[in-house]
C-alpha cells in the first residue's frame, strides 16, 4: 500500500459531479493498493502512521502534534495512479497495482478498519468514481508512506 499524505485546512470532494464528502483540518490521504495489501498487518501499520504522524505545529511552532492530538480528521481517497510506473516510455504502466475488484475490496476493508480503529473522524472518496477534490493545503506538508517500506 502506498499513501500520499497532505496536511490540509479543509477538503471537499465531489464524486461523478455530485457533492460527496468534506472535512475541516486534518490529513488527506491518497491510497494506492497492490495485491496482498488486504491484511491486518498492513492496515494497522498504515493507519498507525496516519493518525500518529506528528505533522501539526505545537505552541512553539514545531511539528509535534498528530491528528489525534489536535482532534482533526482523516480523509481517505483511493488512487490507483500511485502505482504508476513511468520508467519506460511515456505512458505509465499500472500493472503493479491490484486488479480493480481486489483493490475495491481492500479499499473498503481498509476504510472500515480505519473507521473502527482510527480514534478520529474518517471521511472518504468513492472508489473508482471520477472525483473532483478541492483542498486548502497547509504548509504545504506532503509525505509518502509505503507498507513495503521502500521509502
List each model region and its residues.
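An anionic oxygen-ligand recognition environment, strongly enriched in 2H phosphoesterase
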Residues: 96
Amino acid at each position: 500500500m502506498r499513501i500520499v499524505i497532505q496536511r490540509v485546512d479543509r477538503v471537499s470532494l465531489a464524486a461523478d459531479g455530485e457533492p460527496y464528502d468534506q472535512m475541516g483540518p486534518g490529513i488527506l490521504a491518497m491510497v494506492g493498493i497492490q495485491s496482498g495489501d488486504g491484511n491486518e498487518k498492513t492496515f494497522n501499520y498504515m493507519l498507525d502512521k496516519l493518525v500518529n504522524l506528528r505533522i501539526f505545529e505545537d505552541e512553539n511552532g514545531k511539528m509535534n502534534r498528530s491528528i489525534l492530538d489536535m482532534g482533526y480528521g482523516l480523509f481517505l481517497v483511493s488512487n490507483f495512479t500511485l502505482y504508476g510506473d513511468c520508467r519506460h516510455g511515456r505512458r505509465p504502466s499500472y500493472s503493479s497495482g491490484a486488479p480493480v475488484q481486489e483493490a475495491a475490496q481492500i479499499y473498503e476493508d481498509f476504510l472500515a478498519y480505519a473507521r473502527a480503529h482510527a480514534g478520529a473522524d474518517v471521511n472518504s472518496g468513492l472508489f473508482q468514481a471520477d472525483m473532483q477534490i478541492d483542498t486548502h493545503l497547509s504548509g504545504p506538508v506532503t509525505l509518502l508512506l509505503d507498507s513495503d517500506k521502500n521509502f
